[in-house]
């Protein structure tokens, strides 16, 4: 062992003193199967090179041929994103290749050390602008940058009919950014350049590191029509046809490119195995279903190209022309900040407009289709594609981030995100024209059709030579557009309330209701987690004031505004288990509680919020007889189910809301009055939260409120369609039906009316709280450091959206957060905790609450906003896959929906098992104790103790 060490040391020492031509060989920096790489110095200039030293004695004839092929290829290739060959020297025992020195190492090291990149001074600015995600791979801006440069190199190779055959992160080397190289302090050692153009990026961003493709040892000239059959490359990145020992062509490189892109996005290869046989089995078993980690945020267009590259059959893969023309390759990188953004703006302002979440046009005599005007509360910045960047497809099984700039079709967060939660790039509507994909740094702006037409006309008429003047009047135009859009938010609330008022005023429906025609709005904020009280009055926003068209009710009337409906639907004794579960979920699962002394006593104890009331089980006459009454009952069930799901989402949002906006001072001491030592507005109290934490909470609360609004809006849409049919048929408005049918129809009508009143009240409350959260988010974004990507100064005017503020500072969600991803993660967390407690036989009623709430959350995730009357789940999934692009519904692709369904079914199964267990326990406890015997007594089991054994 000692002799070996001495020999190695002396060899290294001799190597350091060895000169090869005008170069000296220094320390070793890498080692492969057949070659060792050293850092070298060009003696005349002192510049650094990488010297690849190959020991010829270790090579057979075929490997020598490969080496000479590599040399010939490198001599003919001059491209900024391909490592250049500077010189080549051959001796009797070695061949030395002097190549460009890439001081940042390879891409695999870059990915593994992403959390420490800021320690390198050449990368510090990059990390500050585009922070790396806590989990997963690289920031999506960096991913797109590297992918563009790799694609540029591959396109150069394809033009010359070369196939690399060993594309992998270890063969993708990095050098500092051109900007850094240009301003590097003189005097220190520099990397030797093959030419001036070798450090000028052809694509990408000048402030980010440059990527160079290296190691052409397995490369060869292979025209498109030719096939090879040599097993080459690294197994983890090999194409399946190579692993199968089949003939292959240049399309094998497409697979390797897809694996590299996947690893950049997620931090790990798409398939891992201990040998190539198992690797091939995994690829075959996967059936081209490429999954992305659920905790990551990935843009839709990036996921699209990965899935098109990673097809196990070469003929199914994207072609090279399609690959080079893909939006991720050709379009500007979204999410740039600071000086990375283009300096010149197009005279025509590019605006991505998000259409209504439901394009279906349904009209009733009373109310036309209720537009989702709350969409104007939020938008998604196409900025950075990191966990804290826009999509982003959220994925999140969600999830998800395409958009008009090639960014994730919001995208996200998640991803997953549904169109109902607008923030995620992967969830933005897919019906966008390719011509919109021109501006590299803007976010979708919610506009109505009329506003869109007016603004498009203005943009099209703008002269080309008015670039400067257009920038100077942008703010004024934004003010005008914002003023117009602000009315639309009120219009949404007005339509909701108008429809609810008409139903409440109907004589037949109103008989059973004691509520007034104009139900007063309930403006409350939910009690904080440790509060001893429930609903508290908060100042009403202008949105609700204008929408209602009247003065706001006082606190007492607001608190009891829904009490009559709760009594109409059912008495407290008829509350179902699900209603109790939903009410208890906010306490046990979401961590929100109220004083135990206020529960179970008094006619109407204060509550955190009005949970959706339960109804008595319908009688048997309403089930399955095929008459119109059956349809009424079905509509009732659908409306109530959707309202219940919205209630669960609302409860989750309230947790975020209470962390974000502290209670008024009077609430901190229950009903005992305010604390004289505490003063100030609750909106100004951050309760110790950092600015970034406030931004995060605001975004999460906002997307959850918007999801709740979408479910409430859907309930109202269904009720509106039912109301229109009934008015045409005269059933509710005064028509006569025989006997019990008339009674059943009236009962169904009353239940729908009650649901509509509840939805109206909740809608107004959620809309107001969403506005408060929006204001909080805008305020927090202004307080971020000026160099932070989320700061308003780092966003273009086109990416701003105003939803009711008097200023021009709009709301931009700068992260990939989606409601679906938040809900999915929360449901998993609750079900896992419940499963652990169930196995331990601890708190079984609490387990039932957790299971039930998780089920409702996952059902809300799967809710299809484009579908009024839901179909059966299996049919819905199948038809949704066929009709939607990429099999996506609300931004959640078909594969992710299947995953959610599997989890949902498992939780339902656990809930059924739990109920059986609880029933058995209750039955056992209700049994009378066994009668005592003078001769024998048992200790509760079937095995008698020694003292109880009868004498023989």
Curated annotation (Swiss-Prot):
Pfam families: ATG1-like_MIT1 (PF12063), ATG1-like_MIT2 (PF21127), Pkinase (PF00069)
Major subcellular site: cytoplasm
Catalytic activity: L-seryl-[protein] + ATP = O-phospho-L-seryl-[protein] + ADP + H(+); L-threonyl-[protein] + ATP = O-phospho-L-threonyl-[protein] + ADP + H(+)
Record's bilayer topology term: Peripheral membrane protein
Keyword Iron: no
Sorted UniProt keywords: ATP-binding, Autophagy, Cytoplasm, Kinase, Membrane, Nucleotide-binding, Protein transport, Serine/threonine-protein kinase, Transferase, Transport
Domain Protein kinase: start-end pairs: 23-329
Comp. bias intervals (Low complexity): 933-952
Molecular function GO labels: ATP binding; protein serine kinase activity; protein serine/threonine kinase activity
Biological function: Serine/threonine protein kinase involved in the cytoplasm to vacuole transport (Cvt) and found to be essential in autophagy, where it is required for the formation of autophagosomes. Involved in the clearance of protein aggregates which cannot be efficiently cleared by the proteasome. Required for selective autophagic degradation of the nucleus (nucleophagy) as well as for mitophagy which contributes to regulate mitochondrial quantity and quality by eliminating the mitochondria to a basal level to fulfill cellular energy requirements and preventing excess ROS production.
Full protein name: Serine/threonine-protein kinase atg1
Source organism (scientific name): Botryotinia fuckeliana (strain B05.10)
């Amino acid at each position: 062992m000692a002799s070996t060490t001495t020999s190695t040391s002396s060899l290294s020492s001799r190597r350091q003193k060895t000169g090869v031509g005008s170069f000296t060989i220094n320390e070793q920096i890498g080692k492969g199967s057949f070659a060792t790489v050293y850092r070298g110095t060009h003696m005349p200039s002192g510049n650094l090179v990488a010297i690849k030293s190959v020991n010829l004695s270790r090579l057979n004839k075929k490997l020598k041929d490969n080496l000479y092929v590599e040399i010939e290829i490198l001599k003919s290739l001059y491209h900024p994103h391909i490592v250049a060959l500077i010189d080549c020297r051959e001796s009797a025992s070695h061949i030395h290749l002097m190549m460009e020195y890439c001081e940042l190492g390879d891409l695999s090291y870059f990915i593994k050390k992403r959390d420490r990149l800021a320690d390198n001074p050449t990368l510090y600015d990059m990390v500050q602008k585009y922070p790396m995600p806590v989990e997963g791979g690289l920031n999506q801006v960096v991913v797109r940058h590297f992918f563009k440069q790799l694609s540029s190199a591959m396109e150069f190779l394809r033009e010359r009919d070369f196939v690399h055959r060993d594309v992998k992160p270890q063969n993708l080397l990095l050098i500092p950014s051109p900007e850094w190289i240009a301003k590097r302090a003189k005097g220190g050692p520099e990397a030797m350049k093959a030419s001036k153009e070798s450090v000028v990026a052809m694509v990408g961003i000048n402030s980010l590191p440059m990527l160079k493709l290296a190691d052409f040892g397995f490369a060869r000239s292979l025209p498109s029509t030719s096939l090879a059959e040599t097993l080459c490359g690294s197994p983890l990145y090999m194409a399946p046809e190579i692993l199968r020992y089949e003939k292959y062509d240049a399309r094998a490189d497409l697979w390797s490119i897809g694996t590299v892109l996947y690893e950049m996005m997620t931090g790990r290869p798409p398939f891992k195995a201990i040998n190539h046989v198992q690797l091939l089995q995994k690829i075959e078993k996967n059936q081209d279903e490429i999954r992305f980690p659920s905790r990551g945020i990935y843009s839709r267009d990036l996921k699209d190209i990965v899935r098109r590259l990673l097809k196990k059959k070469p003929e199914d893969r994207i072609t090279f022309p399609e690959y080079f023309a893909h939006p991720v390759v050709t379009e500007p990188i979204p999410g740039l900040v600071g000086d990375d953004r283009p300096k010149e703006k197009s005279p025509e302002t590019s605006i991505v407009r998000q259409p209504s979440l439901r394009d279906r046009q349904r009209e009733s005599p009373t109310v036309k289709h209720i537009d989702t005007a709350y969409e104007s509360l939020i938008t998604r910045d196409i900025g950075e594609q990191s966990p804290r960047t826009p999509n982003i497809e959220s994925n999140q099984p969600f999830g998800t981030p395409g958009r008009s700039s090639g960014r994730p079709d919001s995208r996200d967060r998640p991803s997953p995100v549904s169109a109902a939660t607008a923030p995620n790039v992967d969830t933005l509507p897919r019906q966008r024209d390719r011509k919109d994909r021109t501006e590299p740094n803007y976010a979708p702006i919610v506009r109505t059709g009329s506003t869109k037409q007016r603004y498009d006309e203005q943009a099209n008429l703008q002269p080309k030579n008015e670039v400067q003047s257009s920038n100077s009047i942008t703010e004024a135009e934004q003010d005008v557009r914002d003023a117009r859009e602000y009315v639309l938010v009120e219009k949404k609330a007005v339509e909701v309330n108008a429809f609810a008022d008409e139903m409440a005023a109907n004589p037949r429906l109103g008989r059973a209701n004691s509520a007034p025609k104009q139900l007063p709005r309930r403006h409350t904020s939910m009690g904080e987690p440790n509060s001893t009280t429930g609903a508290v009055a908060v100042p009403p926003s202008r949105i609700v004031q204008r929408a209602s068209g009247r003065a706001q009710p006082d606190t007492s009337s607001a608190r009891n505004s829904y009490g009559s409906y709760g009594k109409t639907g059912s008495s407290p004794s008829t509350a179902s288990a699900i209603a109790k579960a939903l009410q208890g979920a906010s306490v046990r699962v979401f961590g929100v509680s109220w004083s135990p002394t206020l529960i179970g006593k008094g006619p109407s104890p204060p509550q955190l919020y009005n949970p959706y009331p339960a109804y008595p089980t319908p009688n048997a006459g309403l089930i399955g007889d095929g008459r119109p009454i059956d349809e009424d009952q079905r509509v009732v069930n659908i409306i109530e189910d959707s309202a219940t799901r919205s209630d669960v989402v609302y409860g989750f949002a309230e947790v975020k809301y209470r962390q974000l906006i502290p209670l008024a001072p009077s609430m901190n001491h229950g009903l005992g009055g305010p604390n004289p030592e505490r003063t100030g507005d609750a909106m100004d109290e951050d309760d110790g939260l950092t600015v970034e934490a406030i931004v995060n909470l605001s975004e999460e609360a906002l997307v959850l409120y918007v999801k709740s609004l979408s479910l409430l809006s859907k309930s109202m849409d269904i009720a509106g369609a039912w109301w229109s049919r009934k008015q045409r048929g005269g059933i509710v408005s005064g028509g006569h039906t025989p006997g019990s049918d008339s009674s059943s129809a009236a009962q169904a009508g009353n239940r729908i009316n009650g649901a509509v009143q509840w939805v109206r009240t909740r809608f107004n409350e959620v809309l107001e709280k969403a506005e408060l959260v929006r204001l909080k988010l805008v305020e927090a974004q202004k307080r971020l450091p000026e160099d932070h990507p989320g700061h308003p100064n780092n966003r273009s005017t086109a990416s701003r959206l105003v939803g009711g503020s008097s200023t021009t500072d709009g709301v931009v969600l700068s992260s990939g957060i989606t409601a679906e991803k938040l809900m999915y993660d929360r449901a998993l967390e609750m079900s896992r905790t419940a499963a652990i407690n169930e196995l331990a036989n601890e708190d079984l009623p609490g387990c039932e609450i957790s299971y039930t709430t998780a089920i409702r959350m996952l059902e809300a995730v799967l809710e299809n906003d484009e579908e009024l009357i839901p179909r059966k789940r299996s049919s819905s999934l199948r038809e949704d896959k066929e009709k939607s692009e990429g099999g996506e519904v609300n931004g959640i692709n078909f594969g992710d929906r299947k995953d959610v369904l599997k989890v949902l079914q498992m939780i339902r199964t656990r809930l059924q098992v739990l109920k059986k267990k609880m029933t058995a326990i209750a039955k056992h406890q209700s049994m009378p104790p066994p009668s005592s015997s003078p001769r024998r007594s048992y200790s509760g089991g079937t095995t008698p103790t020694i003292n109880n054994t009868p004498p023989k």
